[in-house]
Every structure is written in structure tokens, then in C-alpha cells.
Amino acid sequence: MSDNMQPFDETLDDESLDAVDAETTEDCEDVEEFDPFEGMSDEELDALCDEDESLAGFGDVEPGFRSGFVALVGRPNAGKSTLLNACYGKKVAITSPVAQTTRRRMRAVVNRPGYQLVFVDTPGIHKPKDGLGSELNKSALFELNDVDVVAFLIDATKPIGRGDAWVAERVKNARSKKVLVLTKADEADPAQVMEQLKAAHELMEYDDEIVTSSVKNFNVDAFIETVAHFLPEGPRWFPEDMGTDASDETLVAEFVREKVLRRTRDEIPHSVGVICDALEQTKKVLRVHATIYVEREGQKGIIIGKGGEMIKHIGIDARRDLERIFGTQVFLELDVKVKAGWRDDEAQIRRFGYNAED
């Protein structure tokens, strides 16, 4: 147990891929391979070359300064995006009770005295049912050896099953340090937490462990300190004022999709994709146009709603988050279109930005 863990005084409210729990099959998502230089400006990359590929392009390298990447992995709905947001201090990754909410790799940078952490939110590892699911799984598994620490998240409220075991087999073969993170401790009682910890240790060995509750902000700082302990010495990979590597267009698409998921729930979630078509900043307002894509005409009707009421509410919900993120008034225009079978069309998957190699 991590030395950083605090006592929790409140009530703690299926070999092959085919063996994954039916629940896991429904609840899922993936992650993507990334290049730590991807978000750097041309000037920063040029500086690296000018310095004979030394670390000087990052500015002064502080003696003893530590930095690195931490992947948040686990079954769908294990609480990865919620923990990412809690670590960052504000919402950068979308969340919902719907399976497969996370589709894009999302990185959030956390700066603390003496170190910089780059958290990578990944899609839930699951049994894929279509081309999109396969890409998401590839993406998540690629991540395991490209980071310094793998945080394996397990939901404290759900019995550990063969789905967790399948994920654990992949995690334990990674070269990275492994930290067990038991999430949603506020929804479990103490006996349930202890039983989950015991079951988790039967899956694999860990370098450390911690019990958390993101919604109660319980042990979030302790989790950050726990994973930071395993970081190697190195430079700041990203500027101190950079919070996420996601583009404005990506943020728009993701937050609109989140509102669709929350408003429609189980009716059409896996068939929804969103593309931000245009962003135009004027003196007083940010004008945004985005298109919501579904696979069938019936799904389009659900999103539009009777008299346009559903699309209206989706737009209002999304606009509120976008105004908070961009710090300006937002005029959001939404369209809904049908793109049949897009989840099994590689070209369309790439168009939506969900392929593992991007």
C-alpha cells in the first residue's frame, strides 16, 4: 500500500479475448500510440535540431527534475477519464455512464514542483465488435510500452472478472512500472474494498497501489505523488502553461459527443461520431459549426427530437462547456447526418480521428 494513502473515514459506498465479460463487451474503448514531440511547435522542434538533438531545446534542464508519461488503463467505465480530470483540476476528458465514451487519446499535463506528469487517458480495453473497436483496442495496447508508468484502474464496486484478467495479462507484460488504482471507493464499503484489493493482487504484481475516489477528491493528490515517484529524471516535455495537447476542433467534437451520449443514453451511443467543421473567432464570439454523424435515419430522428427539442438541448449543454473551456461567448451550430456503416469503414474511422496510428 502506498505510503501516501490516507485512511478513508467515510463509508466506502473471463483464455482469449473471447472470454471477456459480456459487460466488458458492452462497456468499452481504446487508446492510441503517441509521439511526445507531437504537440511541440515548429520553433521548439527546430531548437532541438539546432542543439544537436540535446535536451537544450526544452530550455534549462533542472538538476533532479523528473518527468514522464502515465497511461490510465482498465476496463470500460473504470473511471479513467474522471481520474484524469481530477488530477488536472478541471474537465478536459469527456465522461458519461455510457460504455465506450473515450475514443480519442487525451493527454493532460500536470506540473508540480520538481516534476511534470503527462497523463494519457485511454479507451477501455474490451472485446471489439467492429472496426472501430479494433482500432481502439490497438491504440490502448500500444500505449503500455510507451509510457513510464501504467496505472491499472479497477472499479471497487464491480466484481473482478475474466475481462480484468485479460487486461492484466497485457499490463503485466509491459516494461513500465505498474500501479494498481482502485477507483470509486466512495461507492463501496470497506469490506468490499479489501476484497477487491485481494482479488486484484491475484491477477498480477504491482509496484504500488492506492485506493481513490475522484468525485470525492479522495487520494487524488496521493495518486499523483505515487506515480511521480517512478518518473525518471528528464526535461519538461511540454510548456508549463500547456494543459492538454487536444486541438480546439477535437475539444469541440468530444464535448458535443458527450452531450449526445448523456441525452440519448442507451439509444444510439456507439453509432455517434462528431466532426468540428469550422471555428471562427470574431471580436465578441467564437462561431462553431459541428456535424453529428449516425448510422441510421432512425437515429438521426432521435438526436433531432420532436420539433428539434433534443438537438436544441444538446447544443445548449455543449455550448456551456465550450464557453467555459474557451473563455468566450460561443455560437454553436449543429447538423445531423447519416453515414451508414462508418464504424467498419477504415477511411471513415480515420476521418473521425479514431485510428490507433494517428
Please identify what each model-predicted range represents:
Residues D248-D358:
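P-loop NTP-binding site
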Residues T102, I125-K127, P159-I160, A188-D189, ...:
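Catalytic P-loop NTPase motifs of RecA-like helicase/translocase cores
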Residues V110-Q116, E135-E209, R263, E280-V285:
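Conserved C-terminal guanine-recognition region of P-loop GTPase G domains, centered on the G4
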Residues G79, N219, M310:
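Conserved glycine(s) of the Walker
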Residues N85, R104, A108, K138-N145, ...:
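Solvent-exposed alpha-helical segments within well-ordered globular domains of core cellular machineries
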